[in-house]
C-alpha cells in the first residue's frame, strides 16, 4: 500500500473527529419572569489558558453562534444585553449564565463553549431552557359551623348516714385478794361494726344499724368496783365506712386467759357507747357521743420477782438446742483433730524416709572415694 492513500485516509479521519462536537445537554425548566441560571462548570480552569463564551443554539464547530457573553479567563469582555450575567467565580471555573427577567423568546438551546488549548480539546455544553407560565391555583375556603349544645343534668344529693362502731369491751375478774391461790383473769372482747348507705331520699336510721354491745359475765370470780372514771373521745376507737346499701354486722369474740399470782396488778375496763340517730332530711353524718371508760386502780403489795418467772417448758426448749449444738461442735472438733494428726504423721514419715535416702547416698559417695584412693595407692 502506498503512502499517499494512507495519508489521505488519516486526514479524513482527523477532519471527521474535528467536525464531531464533544457536547452534553442539560434541561432547565423555569417560570416566566423569574431569574434563570444555566449551569456551566469547568474544574480545570486556568485564567492564563482558558476562555469561554455563551451563544444561542447548538454549539458550532468553532466559536459561539450568536454570542451572548464572552470572557478572557478572568473577567467579562463583552455581552449582548445587560440581562445576561456571569454571577459565579470565573477564576474557579464557575461560568454559569444568569438571565434576568426572561421572556418566551428566551426559550431554546444555549451553548457554553470553554476553549482549551490544543486540537479538538474544547468543552461544549448544551443547555435547553424551557419557560412555562405560572399556574393559577384556586383556593377553596371551607366554612365550618360549630354548634354548642348545653345539657343541664339534675343535681342529686345523696345522704349518707353512718353509725359508730361499738368499742371493744374488756372485763377482768379476780377472786378475793386474801386467798393465796393464783388468780384467773379472763378477757372477753366484743367488736361490732355496722356500715349503712341510704338511698337518695332521706330516711330514718334503720334499726339494724345500731351496734349492740353485750358483755358476757365472767365465771371466775366477782367483778371489782370502779375507783376512777376517764372519758375518752369516740374518734380514737371507731372507724366507719359507707360502702353498701345493706347493713353488715361483724362480731368477733375472742377470749384469752392469763395465769397470774395472787398479788399481781388487776385492772378492769368497761366501755359503753351511745348512738344518736339522725333526724329526717339531714344530709350530714350523725356524730356519735363520746365514750365513757371506767378503769380501776392498781393494787399495792405485789412483789416484782413473781413477774419474771418463766415456765420450765420454755427453759427446756432453750437449753436442749444449746446443749445439742455444743455436743455437735465437740464431735466436729474431734474428727478434725484425727485428720490433722494423720496428716502430720504422714508428713513426718516422709521426712524420715528422705533423711534415710540422703544418708545412703552419702555412704555410697564415701565408699566410691575410698575405692578411688585405693586404686591410686596401687
Swiss-Prot record:
Glycosylation sites: 291
GO cellular component entries: extracellular region; plasma membrane
Residue ranges constituting the Ig-like V-type domain according to the UniProt record: 25-126
Region spans: Disordered: 136-160, 269-304
Phosphoserine, modified sites: 358
Major localisation: membrane
A matching Pfam family: V-set
GO MF annotation list: phosphatidylserine binding
Membrane topology of the entry: Single-pass type I membrane protein
Subcellular localization: Cell membrane; Secreted, Extracellular exosome
Signal peptide start-end: 1-24
Chain intervals with Polar residues compositional bias: 269-297
Cytoplasmic side: 336-378
Disulfide bonds: 40-112, 53-64, 59-111
Keywords, comma-separated and alphabetical: Cell membrane, Disulfide bond, Glycoprotein, Immunoglobulin domain, Membrane, Phosphoprotein, Secreted, Signal, Transmembrane, Transmembrane helix
Family matches, as InterPro entries: Ig-like_dom, Ig-like_dom_sf, Ig-like_fold, Ig_sub, Ig_V-set
Transmembrane annotation, as ranges: 315-335
Extracellular-facing ranges: 25-314
Gene Ontology annotations of biological process type: apoptotic cell clearance; cytoskeletal rearrangement involved in phagocytosis, engulfment
Gene3D superfamilies reported in the protein's UniProt record: Immunoglobulins
Assembly mode: Interacts with MERTK; this interaction enhances TIMD4-mediated efferocytosis. Interacts with EPHA2.
Function: Phosphatidylserine receptor that plays different role in immune response including phagocytosis of apoptotic cells and T-cell regulation. Controls T-cell activation in a bimodal fashion, decreasing the activation of naive T-cells by inducing cell cycle arrest, while increasing proliferation of activated T-cells by activating AKT1 and ERK1/2 phosphorylations and subsequent signaling pathways. Also plays a role in efferocytosis which is the process by which apoptotic cells are removed by phagocytic cells. (Microbial infection) Plays a positive role in exosome-mediated trafficking of HIV-1 virus and its entry into immune cells.
Domain note: Recognizes phosphatidyl serine via its immunoglobulin domain.
Family per similarity comment: Belongs to the immunoglobulin superfamily. TIM family.
Name the UniProt record assigns to this protein: T-cell immunoglobulin and mucin domain-containing protein 4
Organism, scientific name: Homo sapiens
Lineage: Eukaryota, Metazoa, Chordata, Craniata, Vertebrata
Gene symbol of the encoding locus: TIMD4
Amino acid at each position: 500500500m502506498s503512502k499517499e492513500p494512507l495519508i489521505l485516509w488519516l486526514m479524513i479521519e482527523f477532519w471527521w473527529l474535528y467536525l464531531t462536537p464533544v457536547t452534553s445537554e442539560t434541561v432547565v425548566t423555569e417560570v416566566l419572569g423569574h431569574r434563570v441560571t444555566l449551569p456551566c462548570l469547568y474544574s480545570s480552569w486556568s485564567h492564563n489558558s482558558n476562555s469561554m463564551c455563551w451563544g444561542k443554539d447548538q454549539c458550532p464547530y468553532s466559536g459561539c453562534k450568536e454570542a451572548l457573553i464572552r470572557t478572557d479567563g478572568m473577567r467579562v469582555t463583552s455581552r449582548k444585553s445587560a440581562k445576561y450575567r456571569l454571577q459565579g467565580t470565573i477564576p474557579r471555573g464557575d461560568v454559569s449564565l444568569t438571565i434576568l427577567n426572561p421572556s418566551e423568546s428566551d426559550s431554546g438551546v444555549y451553548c457554553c463553549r470553554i476553549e482549551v488549548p490544543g486540537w479538538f480539546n474544547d468543552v461544549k455544553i448544551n443547555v435547553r431552557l424551557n419557560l412555562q407560565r405560572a399556574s393559577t391555583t384556586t383556593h377553596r375556603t371551607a366554612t365550618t359551623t360549630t354548634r354548642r349544645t348545653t345539657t343541664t343534668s339534675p343535681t342529686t344529693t345523696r345522704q349518707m348516714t353512718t353509725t359508730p362502731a361499738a368499742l371493744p369491751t374488756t372485763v377482768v375478774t379476780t377472786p378475793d385478794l386474801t386467798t393465796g391461790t393464783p388468780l384467773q383473769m379472763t378477757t372477753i372482747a366484743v367488736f361490732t361494726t355496722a356500715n349503712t348507705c341510704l338511698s337518695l331520699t332521706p330516711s330514718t336510721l334503720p334499726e339494724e344499724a345500731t351496734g349492740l354491745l353485750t358483755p358476757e359475765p365472767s365465771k371466775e370470780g366477782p367483778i371489782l368496783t370502779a375507783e376512777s372514771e376517764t372519758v375518752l373521745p369516740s374518734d380514737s376507737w371507731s372507724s366507719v365506712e359507707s360502702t353498701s346499701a345493706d347493713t353488715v354486722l361483724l362480731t368477733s369474740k375472742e377470749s384469752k386467759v392469763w395465769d397470774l399470782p395472787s398479788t399481781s396488778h388487776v385492772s378492769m375496763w368497761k366501755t359503753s357507747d351511745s348512738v344518736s340517730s339522725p333526724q329526717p332530711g339531714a344530709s350530714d353524718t350523725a356524730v356519735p357521743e363520746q365514750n365513757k371508760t371506767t378503769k380501776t386502780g392498781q393494787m399495792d403489795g405485789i412483789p416484782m420477782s413473781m413477774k419474771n418467772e418463766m415456765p420450765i417448758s420454755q427453759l427446756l426448749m432453750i437449753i436442749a438446742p444449746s446443749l445439742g449444738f455444743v455436743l455437735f461442735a465437740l464431735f466436729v472438733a474431734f474428727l478434725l483433730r484425727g485428720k490433722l494428726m494423720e496428716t502430720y504423721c504422714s508428713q513426718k514419715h516422709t521426712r524420715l524416709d528422705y533423711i534415710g535416702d540422703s544418708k545412703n547416698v552419702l555412704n555410697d559417695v564415701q565408699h566410691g572415694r575410698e575405692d578411688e584412693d585405693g586404686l591410686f595407692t596401687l
